[in-house]
A protein has these predicted regions:
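Membrane-interface "cap" regions at the ends of multi-pass membrane proteins
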Residues: 1-39, 43-49, 62-67, 78-79, ...
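Extracellular loop-to-transmembrane helix junctions
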Residues: 13, 37-142, 147, 277-282, ...
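Hydrophobic, membrane-embedded alpha-helices of multi-pass small-molecule transporters
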Residues: 16-35, 152-158, 213-295, 322-342
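TM-loop-TM module centered on a large, flexible mid-protein loop between adjacent transmembrane helices
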Residues: 84-86, 91, 123-133, 209-230, ...
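Membrane-helix boundary/coupling elements in multi-pass transport proteins
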Residues: 101-119, 245-263, 285, 320-360, ...
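Hydrophobic alpha-helical segments and their helix-loop junctions in multi-pass secondary transporters
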Residues: 119-126, 179-224, 290-296, 413-423, ...
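Membrane-interface loop-to-helix entry segments
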Residues: 121, 147-210, 274-278, 401-412, ...
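C-terminal membrane-solvent junction of multi-pass transporters and transport-like membrane proteins
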Residues: 144-147, 173, 361-370, 409-466, ...
Length: 490
């Protein structure tokens, strides 16, 4: 395996510095969910304490897994990341499995982020409904308006265009967006610390509550503790409900290997960049969730009524400035998520095309800009489904993002163990980290796919199981069609 570290003959341009790469990873990690999910999932499922513990544990697991990525990237400094690692270590069939699920892990996040644009505008403009004009229809109970479709489509095309005209230009925009996002969240966090309106007593029930049962009983704040998660089983369920989606929450730090061919710096910096991106991501998730509960004495009622609790809390703390902070922060999160996953998805498809897993068309690199133009165009076209289908329908696919990411983590950890053994250069620490990462990858997959009694809100919903079967079926058809073009060992 000594030839693995040789320079690639890639036609992609080396234009990414460490700050660019951090911004890409962090921008992928933090999207719409960090601002929307405190009210939609985190506070009810896990509360402040359960979410904080789950996010910290999830970050620690991701850091453990990141050591495997840091070891493998210098070995295979090519676009494709986990797909490339798997192909070289375990052959073409395993590589197809890994690549196929990574595609859904990355690409579904682009249209899903685009559907948050309408929610952002709705939350900020109050009763004005500025985007609710023109024809409209509903899919799975989600209303879709022409105005929202037009804005989301324009943003998807613009972000895609920036990716096409040069990775450096896109990376500069990404760096600005990610930096501004951190500033907004940190400012809101400090405001909560110094404000008399944010109180620890407001955070109860700290482990969350049974939202469905409470809503069915028309519960109020006076009797919400009846439905609170209590006891060992309740607390464990609260933590695992959020911990199980850690692969989804942190998916994006692994976008770094996808752009490895475009780094203009030493690969020795990969581990530190990944760790910083994960830590910043953990801070944003935990901070937004904690601030939302601390600032609102009646947050359970607001959660049950479907309010955007992060926005309401920011407004309670800082008035109109708080509203501007959240609006700016979530906009940066959405745009950086779209930008980052465009890059990760297109580089993965570019790599798969080069190995015969996708048609050669996906591997075309623009001679002027040095970017995988056709792969990016494909990502744009697929992502335009977001404004058309709406959040609820896409949500069934997005649930698979965590599965796809977990499969990528599994193969990266396994490839690390195999490569370290073959090359004889892996430390005991690295091997232990890889084994732990391998184990947690399996745990994440089990938690999401297999219903476990007593653990509510952890596994897939019915629609997501159906979408998983559909994606596997499409993969089998595609595999049978493309298999003869695969290159690599059996």
């Amino acid at each position: 395996m000594n030839n693995k570290q040789q320079e690639s003959n890639s036609t992609l341009k080396k234009q990414l510095n460490p700050m660019h790469v951090w911004a890409i990873a962090f921008g992928c990690v933090i999207g719409w969910g960090s601002f929307i999910n405190p009210g939609k999932k985190f506070l009810s499922n896990s509360g402040v304490a359960g979410t904080a513990i789950a996010m910290v544990l999830g970050a620690l697991v991701m850091i453990i897994i990141a050591f495997s990525y840091a070891y493998m990237v210098p070995k295979y400094p090519k676009a494709g990341g986990e797909f490339t690692f798997t192909k070289n270590c375990f052959g073409k069939n395993a590589a197809f499995l890994c690549g196929w699920f990574l595609v859904v892990a990355y690409l579904t996040n682009v249209p899903m982020n685009s559907t948050a644009i309408g929610l952002i505008v709705d939350g900020l403009d109050g009763p004005a409904d500025i985007l609710k004009f023109g024809f409209h229809y509903s899919i799975a109970g989600f209303d879709i308006y022409m105005g929202e479709m037009l804005l989301a489509t324009a943003i998807l095309v613009l972000m895609g265009y920036l990716n096409i005209i040069g990775v450096q230009k896109a990376a500069i925009v990404q760096t600005i967006l990610s930096s501004l996002l951190v500033i907004c969240v940190f400012t809101l966090f400090v405001a909560a610390l110094v404000s008399s309106k944010a109180k620890g007593i407001n955070m109860s029930p700290v482990w969350g509550f049974d939202k469905s049962a409470a809503m069915a009983a028309n519960a109020t704040m006076s009797d919400i503790n009846i439905y609170a998660h209590k006891g060992t089983a309740g607390i464990l369920s609260a933590i695992l409900a959020t911990f199980a989606i850690a692969p989804w929450a942190y998916v994006g730090f692994d976008a770094i290997p996808q752009a490895a061919e475009e780094f203009n710096f030493s690969f020795k910096k990969v581990s530190s960049i990944m760790i910083v991106a994960i830590v910043f991501g953990c801070f944003v998730y935990t901070s937004n969730n904690t601030v939302a509960a601390a600032a609102l004495a009646n947050w359970p009622e607001r959660v049950m009524s479907g309010e955007w609790v992060v926005l309401v809390a920011a407004t309670e703390l800082l008035g109109i400035f708080g509203k501007v902070l959240v609006g700016t922060g979530v906009s940066c999160a959405v745009l950086s998520g779209i930008m980052g996953f465009y890059l990760a998805s297109s580089r993965l498809m570019y790599s798969m095309s080069g190995e015969g897993y996708l048609p050669k068309w996906f591997g075309y690199v623009d001679k002027k800009y040095g970017t995988p133009k056709n792969a990016i165009l494909f990502c744009i076209i697929i992502s335009l489904s977001g404004p058309i289908l709406g959040r609820e329908a896409l949500g069934w696919f997005v649930d698979m993002s965590a599965i796809g990411a977990s499969i990528g983590y599994f193969f990266t950890a396994a490839a690390t163990l195999a490569t370290a053994k073959a090359d004889g250069d892996g430390t005991k620490f690295l091997k232990v980290m890889a084994m732990i990462g391998l184990g947690f990858s399996v745990i994440f997959i089990i938690l999401q796919l297999i219903p476990i009694p007593g653990l509510n809100g952890v596994h897939f919903g019915k629609e997501s199981y159906i979408m998983l079967i559909v994606w596997i079926a499409i993969g089998l058809v595609f595999y049978s069609m493309q298999r003869k073009f695969f290159s690599g060992k059996e």
